[in-house]
């Protein structure tokens, strides 16, 4: 006797099940799941795979998303502890790692998370050799370097989420001070995603009007409006949120989804993401820091050569030295 499905549906062709825009997220903690829901709501993937070693948590999160399938257009959500579920991904987002504790700097996390990367990165590449890898785990700049070394992929395809979120926070706070929406406030933060990040006050503008032309002291200690406090707030944001709710999630999830959209849709938008900066601004070491990069289907296709003033360049080099002093002693 035929089944209800056989009576209802007659199959006409055997379809190839290879996904065209598969995304894998490694790590189903707060950040990984924020990335997942944002990606689903933006309809960026035809298949979403989740990977984690915490099997019960993974199963629960997967079921929870699958039960919402009516409300988004991703046809397939899969998960597993085994990385075979990630096979043939276009983008692999790595959020796995030890969580930053209250008062702990991102750099203090480093060796713990380097050890985790050693068990993750080679397996990802084995199953998705053509993927673009997006590193989100902190300290993101150093871990992007580690992931690049472990993966054997071109540096252009191993990208750190970097200062994309720092710059978003920067623009939000500028907009809040001016009473203008963040999309109309333009400003960049480069360097480390962390305490040594560099605000490019020389380029901050609204509608092409550089704020520095209105007040040359903008962003300095002698600025009467205390714009410098905005950068201090950017640096302190994660610490404050972790103190208040235990972790950050939503803004980084939205930021990562923004990067994924630029890559998958080949938008060639410019983002401040962590990439190899050796040879730029006099930096001689293999270091990953955020600079404005063009993102498209091949990952980082171009970098924007920002004209830094003397103070900004000195701060960028200081940021590089801060990372190098930690990175040079890593073992992996």
UniProtKB/Swiss-Prot annotation:
BP GO terms, sorted: lactate metabolic process; pyruvate metabolic process
Residues the record lists as binding NAD(+): 29-57, 99, 138
NAD found in the keyword field: yes
InterPro entries: L-lactate/malate_DH, L-lactate_DH, L-lactate_DH_AS, Lactate/malate_DH_C, Lactate/malate_DH_N, Lactate_DH/Glyco_Ohase_4_C, NAD(P)-bd_dom_sf
Cellular compartment(s): Cytoplasm
A UniProt-annotated Pfam family: Ldh_1_C
Entry keyword annotation includes DNA-binding: no
Catalytic residue list: 193
PROSITE patterns to which the protein is assigned, alphabetical: L_LDH (PS00064)
Enzyme class, UniProt record, top EC level: oxidoreductase
SUPFAM superfamilies found in the cross-reference section: LDH C-terminal domain-like, NAD(P)-binding Rossmann-fold domains
GO cellular component terms, A-Z: mitochondrion
Function statement: Possible role in sperm motility.
Quaternary context: Homotetramer. Interacts with RABL2/RABL2A; binds preferentially to GTP-bound RABL2.
Protein name: L-lactate dehydrogenase C chain
Organism per entry: Sus scrofa
Lineage: Eukaryota, Metazoa, Chordata, Craniata, Vertebrata
């Amino acid at each position: 006797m035929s089944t209800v499905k056989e009576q209802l549906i007659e199959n006409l062709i055997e379809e190839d099940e290879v996904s065209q825009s598969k995304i894998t997220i490694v790590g189903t903690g707060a950040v990984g799941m924020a990335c997942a829901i944002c990606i689903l709501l933006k309809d960026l993937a035809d298949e979403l795979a989740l990977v984690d070693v915490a099997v019960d948590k993974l199963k629960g999160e997967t079921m929870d998303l699958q039960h919402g399938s009516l409300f988004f257009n991703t046809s397939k959500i899969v998960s597993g502890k085994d990385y075979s579920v990630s096979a043939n991904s276009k983008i692999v987002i790595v959020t796995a790692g030890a969580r930053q504790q209250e008062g702990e700097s991102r750099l203090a996390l480093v060796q713990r998370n380097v050890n985790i990367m050693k068990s993750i990165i080679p397996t990802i590449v084995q199953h998705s050799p053509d993927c673009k890898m997006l590193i989100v785990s902190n300290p993101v700049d150093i871990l992007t370097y580690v992931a690049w070394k472990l993966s054997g992929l071109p540096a252009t395809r191993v990208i750190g989420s970097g200062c994309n979120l720092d710059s978003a926070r920067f623009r939000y706070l500028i907009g809040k001070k001016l009473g203008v929406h963040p999309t109309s406030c333009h400003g960049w933060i480069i360097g480390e995603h962390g305490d040594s990040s560099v605000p490019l006050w020389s380029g901050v503008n609204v509608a092409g009007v550089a704020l520095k032309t209105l007040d040359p002291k903008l962003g300095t200690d002698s600025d009467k409006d205390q714009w410098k406090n905005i950068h201090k707030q950017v640096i302190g944001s994660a610490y404050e949120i972790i103190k208040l709710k235990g972790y950050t999630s939503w803004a980084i999830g939205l930021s990562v989804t923004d990067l994924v959209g630029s890559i998958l849709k080949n938008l060639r938008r410019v983002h401040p993401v962590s990439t190899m900066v050796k040879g730029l601004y006099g930096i001689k070491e293999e270091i990953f820091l955020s600079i404005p990069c063009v993102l498209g289907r091949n990952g980082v296709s171009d970098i924007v050569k920002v004209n830094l003033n003397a103070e900004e360049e000195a701060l960028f080099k200081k940021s590089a030295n801060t990372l190098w002093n930690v990175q040079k002693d890593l073992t992996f």
